[in-house]
Structures are given as C-alpha cells and as structure tokens.
Amino acid sequence: MSKVNRNIRGFVFAAVLGLASAANAGEVVVVMAAGATAPSKDVIANVYLGRSTELKPMDLPESNPARQYFYKKATDRDAAQVKAVWSRITFTGQGKPPKELADAAAVKKAVASDPKAIGYILKADVDSTVKVILSLE
C-alpha cells in the first residue's frame, strides 16, 4: 500500500472515530431561548453557513467533538469546510463567524439571554433555561 493510501485511510479512520466519539458522548441538540420560535433545519444550516443573519449563532470550541458532529449533521459539511466558508465571508467583509464560547454552559447562558441566539449542545446538558428545537441523530 502506498504512503498516500495509508495517509488517506488514517484520515478517514480519524474522522469516523471523531464522529463516533461525539455520538457516543450523547445526542447533539440545537437550542434557543425557552420562548423563541423554532426555525427550520434549512434556516439553521443557512445561519451557520453565513447565508442568513436572522439569528445569532453560537459555536462550541473546535476541540469539542460535538462541533464536528453538529456541522456534519446540520449542514452536511465538516467543520473544516465550514471554517473555510467563514474565512471567505470574513475576508470579503460580508459577515462574522459564529461566536465561539467555552463550553455548553456558556452556550446555554448566551442562548437563554437572547431570543435571537441559537446554539448546539449535548442533550444531557439541556435544562429549563433553553428549548430544544432540533435533535441531530
């Protein structure tokens, strides 16, 4: 087997392992403030891909496995592809990327305090301060 094929296999294995670890950690859910109106999955994808500004997206850190899982399930793109989209949008002055917060508690706090904010966390982290608007399985 060539070195390139081994590298590709290693990358694919790492990607699958990353998605599996997020899935094993728990179901990822999209949340908004308790009284907010739930948008469609398409609107959520558009917000996180910079195509819509009707909501304020919140992001978990790049190191959080739920982030990769969320982007794959919500936008059909991996986190690196989404990062490239936001690099282009930022460079051309057309927008700012989602606000990156430290952890699920920070996402819940931001979402609960702003009816236009949207974020994603593990289902196990949901409490009465936020409303689940979409489950990603």
Sequence positions of predicted segments:
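Hydrophobic alpha-helical segments
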Residues: 11-12, 22, 116
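Sec/Tat signal peptide C-region and signal peptidase I cleavage site
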Residues: 19-25
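Bacterial N-terminal signal peptides that target proteins for export
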Residues: 2-12
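Flexible loop/hinge segments at secondary-structure junctions
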Residues: 25-137
